[in-house]
């Protein structure tokens, strides 16, 4: 029997939810070898049967699935029992338990989370706004932003902004060269929007900037990567954040998701105190 597990991901939609769940699972079992096969938009018994026949040919087959159509999900589970293949429904019990708790039947419509509702359009609008207001562009629109991120170069402003946009927040980010980088309207009214300063450890920033220069195949800019210059940049940025009473997040050992979660908490606090 092979020591490599054959993981089959079966979804009746885009598979986004399933991918995220499996990512979390495999992080817990780092020494396990596995191959992954993904089957998305699986919505018929014929499709399921073909996948199960394929899985049966492999040793150590495991199936994870997100299928909201109860009859199709039951068909898959029965096929798994028949062929002695372990099958795990990622959403089944969760939807059933929520249905009981809320005393309401679930719609069981695939891709329900992608319905073109008001929230969907708000997210699209947030993404468009954020892309147009990246890296100091259109800073005169600070009053239209839900969030404003400030920080010296390479403090994850852009990826964090894009992540926040996908969560529905119109985000504008500004590279902080000095205090003059900040729009006058924001200096006059620091609470005009929810402003968050991003900072990091100097040596970490040196490494990131050097990697950036290498990736672009550019000659090293001594001012851009000099530790003393960077320490001064960061200290000046911190002074600016303190002056205008803007909360600060150190992104040194944080993922984009962790940084964004902290920013959203700040936003919610500001909103509640608003």
From Swiss-Prot:
Keyword Nucleotide-binding: yes
Superkingdom of the source species: Bacteria
Keywords, alphabetical: Kinase, Nucleotide-binding, Serine/threonine-protein kinase, Transferase
GO MF annotations, alphabetized: ADP binding; ATP binding; phosphotransferase activity, phosphate group as acceptor; protein serine/threonine kinase activity
InterPro entries noted in UniProt: Kinase-pyrophosphorylase, PPDK_reg
EC number: 2.7.11.32, 2.7.4.27
Record's signal peptide: none
Annotated binding of ADP, by residue: 151-158
Function per UniProt: Bifunctional serine/threonine kinase and phosphorylase involved in the regulation of the pyruvate, phosphate dikinase (PPDK) by catalyzing its phosphorylation/dephosphorylation.
NCBIfam families (alphabetical): PRK05339.1 (NF003742)
Protein name: Putative pyruvate, phosphate dikinase regulatory protein
Species per Swiss-Prot/TrEMBL record: Pelagibacter ubique (strain HTCC1062)
């Amino acid at each position: 029997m092979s020591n490599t597990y054959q993981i089959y991901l079966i979804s009746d939609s885009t598979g986004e939810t399933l991918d995220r769940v499996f990512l979390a699972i495999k992080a817990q079992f780092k020494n396990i070898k596995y191959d992954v096969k993904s089957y998305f938009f699986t919505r018929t018994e014929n499709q399921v049967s073909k996948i199960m026949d394929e899985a049966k040919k492999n040793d150590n087959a495991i199936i994870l699935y997100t299928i909201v159509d109860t009859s199709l999900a039951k068909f898959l589970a029965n096929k798994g029992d028949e062929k002695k293949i372990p099958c795990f429904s990622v959403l089944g019990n969760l939807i059933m338990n929520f249905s009981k708790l809320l005393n309401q039947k679930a719609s069981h419509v695939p891709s329900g989370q992608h319905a073109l509702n008001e929230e969907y359009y708000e997210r699209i609008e947030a993404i468009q706004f954020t892309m147009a207001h990246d890296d100091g562009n259109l800073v005169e629109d600070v009053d239209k932003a839900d969030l404003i991120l400030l920080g010296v170069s390479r403090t994850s402003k852009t990826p964090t902004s894009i992540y926040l946009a996908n969560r529905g927040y119109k985000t504008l980010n500004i590279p902080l060269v000095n205090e003059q980088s900040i729009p006058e309207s924001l200096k006059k009214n620091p609470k005009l929007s929810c402003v968050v300063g991003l900072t990091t450890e100097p040596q970490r920033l040196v490494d990131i900037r050097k990697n950036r220069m290498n990736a672009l195949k550019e000659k090293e800019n001594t001012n851009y990567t000099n530790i003393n210059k960077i320490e001064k940049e960061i200290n000046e940025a911190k002074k600016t954040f303190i002056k205008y009473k803007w909360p600060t997040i150190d992104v040194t050992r944080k993922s984009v998701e962790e940084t964004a979660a902290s920013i959203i908490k700040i936003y919610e606090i500001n909103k509640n105190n608003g």
